[in-house]
Amino acid sequence: MSGEGVSGLLGSGAIVRLLGVRAFEPEAVARAVDGARGLLPEPAQRALAESGLEGLAEAVLLERQFGAHHFAPSPSRRLYYHVRPFLPAKARALLRRGVVSRTVPSDSLHWPIEDRFVSFAERVRAVLEESCSMRTLPWWPSGHSFAVVLTHDVEGPFGLAHLMDVLTVEREAGFRSSVSFVGDAYDVPDSLLRELRAEGFEIALHGWRHDGRDFSSGSLFNQRLPRMNQRLREWQALGFRSPMTHRNPVWMQDLDVTWDSSFFDTDPYEPIPGGVMSVWPYMMGRFAELPYTLPQDHTLIETLGETSPRLWLEKLDFLAAHHGMALVNVHPDYVCRNGRLSMYEEFLEEVTHRAGYWHALPRDVASWTLERWGS
């Protein structure tokens, strides 16, 4: 994998579109950007200085600030996923931490809150509104202040068996979510899909197999691509999230989806760490990218040993204050063990006490993003 083909993927004016400032004169935008550039990380500042806003967009929204080969699997990671099926769970966890996760400099992106691009965006919008007596585009429809999006990845048979436990908690709190199933790992009954659709939930695809190899090479990705697209059609699914958030923004353009959520604003704990720094959705080529912005439940539970939604709620407060998208990914495979579901239940209860949020399914956010992108 490499960064080849990335140039031009976002289209022209991605930063201007994301910030909702297309109605302003380019000269005014340039002045506002110049005044806010110091808020960005050094690699993003260099990209802006060398290649303007198009360079900044690629550095941030396509993660080019981490290098042209950021998405390339290392030899150790390739080996790990070849032997992973034969390893016990504890050995997999140790190897994942020590071998698979590449080291990202501690000063690269902050976690769980990365506020530098957010501050940059807000500064540019504020300066333009103050100097030009015009309004920037709203972040969200109908006067909503921020967005709340709930998603689930079902990794295996245990998660499938306990999925309804999670969804029952959501329904009782008045929420609906998107559920991503692996294409070829376990049987997903048609009756379950019909029930989810009837209840107002969304269905998405969680890769072809949960073996870490969907993106291991271009040839294997292309081999699995037709089957993934076929499963998307069979399930009437519009969205995708890659297992283990392995990703390649160029290859993914061939997926028949309207949205993806394989990227994140910041996460040092994923096999490909880094992040797009954006707490808002944006168009990534032919689909809307909805980065998850709340810490992964696996990280909180298995890695950090958290027993409360404390970090989720801290990040939620930040996202609400900055009109962001609070997109959480919860796995029934993890939260339905050892009484952990109460952690998610408490989180949802706290969300209901917030004011002004837009509770939306990913497909609704994708539609809004496409509409806003063209405004």
What are these regions (language model features)?
Residues 191-192, 215-223, 251-253:
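Metal-dependent catalytic neighborhoods of phosphoester/phosphodiester hydrolases
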Residues 200-210, 257-273, 281-283:
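Acidic, His- and aromatic-enriched active-site or binding-groove loops in soluble protein domains
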Residues 181-189, 238-248, 265-266:
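Short, solvent-exposed turn/loop segments enriched in Gly/Ser/Thr/Pro and often Arg
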Residues 243, 263-265, 293, 331:
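Conserved residues at the C-terminal ends of beta-strands
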Residues 205, 242, 328-330:
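Conserved beta-strand positions
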Residues 150-155, 203-219:
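Glycine-rich phosphate-binding "P-loop"
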Residues 1-180, 185-188, 233-234, 250-256, ...:
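Terminal accessory/targeting
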Residues 221-232:
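An active-site-proximal "capping" alpha-helix that borders the catalytic cofactor pocket
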